């Protein structure tokens, strides 16, 4: 296919036009007084959002070279969202600022490669300064404040996330679902829960809740289908003598085995319940092993030379209590050793770092949470579906931000941390004048997030930035109230990881764009006009009219 080429300044100007258009749309959402953006959908109601990455993802231009610039900055927002979960608007504003300042320098004849090296040196220095300024985020109050800021100053969201983290721990899984009412709700599932219920309703022993509840049961874990009762006789006899109930977790229990278990349960000979093992394939084997470690049991598997006929009570796990409903099984207070459980968690964490699949990482994180004890569900309440979507997106953003804060700590919010990190550039020198210019480009660019927050709030950006720069530490400007003061005391905090990733991703893409000298795109297809012969046919129609 034929290509169109653009070179030098012409190429960079086209790219810059796309970046500016995308950044203009994204930056209106920034800060406590940022506005919403309405996105058209191909079906259903439009989406209302204040999330930078959601806006960026929707934008595409017809002009190919403009679009290439916009797509590269979109990558900045997406990468920041994927790694830090928030800070997408900050990243976009920073990328645009670096590119605008850098383009002026390139147009003035400076070497783009040296500018890039200067920018990279400056980013490294600012990143180290941010990490030195970072304070650990340990208490619920700080977690709530981070959540509140990320959820667009919604204190209810910050509070519910802090409460959820307090209940399930920093490593616990917190999921966000659609609620039924107008208020946000938090429910916590203690112990390990997996999404498999009883195989037969005849196992129910609590008619009121339609559940099967077992107190201090044995747990038999089998990684194959059980269809013959003969295989299980020795285990069943041992359990019956002990007088304790039994939970069977197997790939499936069917036929004669299921019928015998149901009859024994109904007659009260052995109080028993059977459920299918969670997951599929290798994940099922791994989850069975998780349950075994949690309950101090053994998985009966022919792969490791254990047969069901030879199983004894020593191979069975134990727990304080088990509740089985139609859809879920919850193991509460398994009797596994803490050291073994922690070793298993460490092993799964190592797998999380190695995996490249987001889906696998999410599933591994769920397994960690189930072993660590607890899953919290935040149900988001809203009056309409449009509001529900918008609110749910804010809750998810806030959740990512609080996780990032717990991971790497917090710095003063509202763009103050970046202004303070400018100090790291005072003594930084490049190898030549062009590199020094690159350092100065970043010095100016890191003021842009605060400038945009202040502008969106209706104040004069230069006045505020200069006043904040004159002071030290956490002194900054609260754009929500129009007051100056200590940002940390006012509860305006940003996760260090979010600020760091936004800066690194923005500088990475913007400096690459500065070093662009040629752009290649497909030529637009020429639409073939309606053939002349067809028009002639139309003329013939006129002739027919004359015949009438």
From Swiss-Prot:
Pfam families: Cpn60_TCP1
Family annotation (InterPro entries): Chaperonin_Cpn60_CS, Cpn60/GroEL, Cpn60/GroEL/TCP-1, GroEL-like_apical_dom_sf, GROEL-like_equatorial_sf, TCP-1-like_intermed_sf
TM region positions: none
Keywords of the record: ATP-binding, Chaperone, Cytoplasm, Isomerase, Nucleotide-binding, Stress response
One BP term from GO: protein refolding
Chief place of localization: cytoplasm
Enzyme class: isomerase
Cellular localisation: Cytoplasm
Recorded superkingdom: Bacteria
Gene Ontology cellular component list: cytoplasm
Record field: catalytic activity: ATP + H2O + a folded polypeptide = ADP + phosphate + an unfolded polypeptide
Enzyme Commission designation: 5.6.1.7
GO molecular function, one term: ATP binding
Residues at which ATP binds: 29-32, 50, 86-90, 414, 478-480, 494
HAMAP family: CH60 (MF_00600)
Family: Belongs to the chaperonin (HSP60) family.
Role according to the record: Together with its co-chaperonin GroES, plays an essential role in assisting protein folding. The GroEL-GroES system forms a nano-cage that allows encapsulation of the non-native substrate proteins and provides a physical environment optimized to promote and accelerate protein folding.
Subunit structure: Forms a cylinder of 14 subunits composed of two heptameric rings stacked back-to-back. Interacts with the co-chaperonin GroES.
Protein name (database record): Chaperonin GroEL
Organism of derivation: Legionella pneumophila (strain Corby)
Higher taxonomy: Bacteria, Pseudomonadati, Pseudomonadota, Gammaproteobacteria, Legionellales
The encoding gene: groEL
